[in-house]
A protein has these predicted regions:
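Structured-RNA-binding interfaces characteristic of tRNA pseudouridine synthases
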Residues: 1-197
Length: 197
């Protein structure tokens, strides 16, 4: 696929590729139907088509978008149970918007990501190119009962969005000043954020 998703994350428009011998001779629609017959109902192939042999879903992705949904009323709707984070209580939405403004650009996200274990920690700490990513846009939207945080970037590190959102909420609840969040982006040598959404 074009990327991994953390546990509990839903993917929309996820692109994947596979190498299939031409001798099979199935149309894209036939492939989609065959795959859907084998997949659980929570996963659907909406389109399948032939692509250039050199195409790679992950390396040819032009960008990725994460949308984090926060349900704010006292009682969580059963329809939102595995689709939103339930956070009842006051949140400073202006602080969330301020954090979003700080996110846009290219930053070293070492303090806002986790080590999956696929690279030594010393490498993560000494090679900033391994943990530097570009965020093209970051927005806060109030959609009725739901607050949506949306991030578009060239790619995301392991648990990066969960740590960004958790840290933003920490500021929006008044538990840390806004400058703390800014320092997570500007000072790669500081303490790792442990505020996971």
């Amino acid at each position: 696929g074009s990327g991994r998703t953390d546990a509990g994350v839903h993917a929309l428009a996820q692109v994947a590729h596979g190498d299939v011998p031409e001798s099979i001779g199935m149309s894209g629609e036939a492939w989609a139907n065959a795959l859907n017959a084998c997949l659980p109902l929570t996963i659907r192939v909406t389109q399948a088509e032939e692509v250039h042999p050199q195409f790679h879903a992950r390396f040819d992705a032009s960008g990725k978008v994460y949308r984090y949904r926060i349900w704010r009323p006292r009682m969580l709707s059963p329809f939102e149970a595995d689709r939103a984070w339930h956070l009842y209580g006051p949140l400073d939405v202006d602080a969330l918007r301020w954090c979003c403004e700080k996110l846009v650009g290219t930053h070293n996200f070492i303090r806002l990501s986790a080590n999956r274990g696929d690279m030594p920690e010393v490498e993560r700490r000494t090679l900033p190119e391994k943990t530097t990513r570009t965020i093209h846009s970051a927005e806060v939207r109030e959609c009725g009962e739901v607050l949506e945080l949306e991030f578009e970037g060239d790619g995301f590190l392991y648990k990066m969005v969960r740590l960004i959102v958790g840290s933003m909420i920490h500021v929006a609840r008044g538990r840390e000043p806004r400058e703390w969040f800014a320092s997570l982006l500007s000072d790669p040598n500081g303490k790792q954020s442990n505020q996971t959404a």
